[in-house]
């Protein structure tokens, strides 16, 4: 069952949306503290987020920015505001759709279904295909598992590992990694990249895989299959 986080301060509308979506077997969760939306988001790990623009303390644009620093979860904006700049701003911040109030619930359900179908099918496709050095790489849970055990990586660590595995046995430059991270809205510096790669190796060492990530001095990194010791 998919979990939906509904960031809406209108209690009547929240109850209506929750009731309607529950009929379609969606679990809908609200926000108990509008100053701690990110904390609640991180704890819940929803499959999709619906955000109103006008909210207490900080507006929906603020929370969209914050969520995008942590996740690529699908986001739908709801708003009674009808100015084109609101829709443009939503899309620029990384929202997947914008629905103007008042709206028909069938439209909301259809958009949710379309987004989740697209995202779920895409991630499932990737999850089934990724193996490396006898380990299973799970794109949905950011985990790496083999006969030794299983570890969960941070978003950045997993992104770096994924990028290296996609080009295994080839050098991936530091600039390429940083650029890819920025394109995915994970803004890190050159020094931070080094820290993340070192952390990644340390975590992979728990599964006996740390040596499979090699440093190519002055060039970048390589995901190997032979396990030669890295620098």
Swiss-Prot record:
BP GO terms, sorted: regulation of DNA-templated transcription
DNA-binding region per Swiss-Prot/TrEMBL record: 127-225
Gene3D superfamilies on file: 3.40.50.2300, Winged helix-like DNA-binding domain superfamily/Winged helix DNA-binding domain
SMART domains registered for this protein in UniProt: REC, Trans_reg_C
GO molecular function: phosphorelay response regulator activity; transcription cis-regulatory region binding
InterPro entries linked to this entry: CheY-like_superfamily, OmpR/PhoB-type_DNA-bd, Sig_transdc_resp-reg_C-effctor, Sig_transdc_resp-reg_receiver, WalR-like, WH-like_DNA-bd_sf
Keywords linked to the UniProt accession: Cytoplasm, DNA-binding, Phosphoprotein, Transcription, Transcription regulation, Two-component regulatory system
Domain of life: Bacteria
CDD domains attached to this UniProt entry: REC_OmpR_NsrR-like, trans_reg_C
Domain Response regulatory as annotated: residue spans: 3-116
Localization, UniProt: Cytoplasm
Modification after translation: Phosphorylated by BceS.
Modified residues (4-aspartylphosphate): 52
GO cellular component terms given for this protein: cytosol; protein-DNA complex
Protein function: Member of the two-component regulatory system BceS/BceR involved in the regulation of bacitracin resistance. When activated by BceS, binds to the upstream region of the bceAB promoter and up-regulates the expression of these two genes.
Protein name: Sensory transduction protein BceR
Source organism of the structure: Halalkalibacterium halodurans (strain ATCC BAA-125 / DSM 18197 / FERM 7344 / JCM 9153 / C-125)
């Amino acid at each position: 069952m998919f979990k939906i986080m509904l960031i809406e301060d209108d209690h009547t509308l929240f109850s209506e949306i929750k009731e309607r979506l529950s009929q379609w077997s969606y679990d809908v969760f609200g926000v108990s503290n509008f100053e701690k939306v990110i904390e609640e988001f991180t704890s819940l790990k929803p499959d999709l987020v619906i955000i109103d623009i006008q909210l207490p303390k900080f507006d929906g644009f603020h929370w969209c920015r914050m969520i995008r620093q942590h996740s690529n979860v699908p986001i739908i904006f709801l708003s009674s505001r009808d100015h084109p700049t609101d829709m443009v701003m939503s899309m620029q911040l990384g929202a997947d759709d914008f629905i103007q109030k008042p709206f028909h619930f069938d439209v909301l359900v259809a958009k949710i279904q379309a987004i989740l179908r697209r995202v779920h099918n895409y991630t499932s496709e990737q999850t089934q295909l990724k193996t490396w050095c006898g380990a299973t790489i799970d794109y949905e849970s950011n985990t790496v598992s083999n006969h030794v055990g299983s570890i969960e990586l941070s978003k950045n660590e997993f992104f770096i590992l994924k990028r290296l595995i996609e080009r295994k046995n080839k050098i991936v430059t530091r600039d390429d990694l940083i650029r890819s991270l920025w394109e995915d809205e994970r803004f890190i510096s050159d020094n931070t990249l080094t820290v993340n790669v070192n952390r990644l190796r340390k975590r992979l060492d728990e599964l006996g895989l740390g040596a499979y990530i090699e440093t190519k001095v002055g060039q970048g990194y390589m995901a190997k299959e032979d396990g030669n010791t890295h620098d």
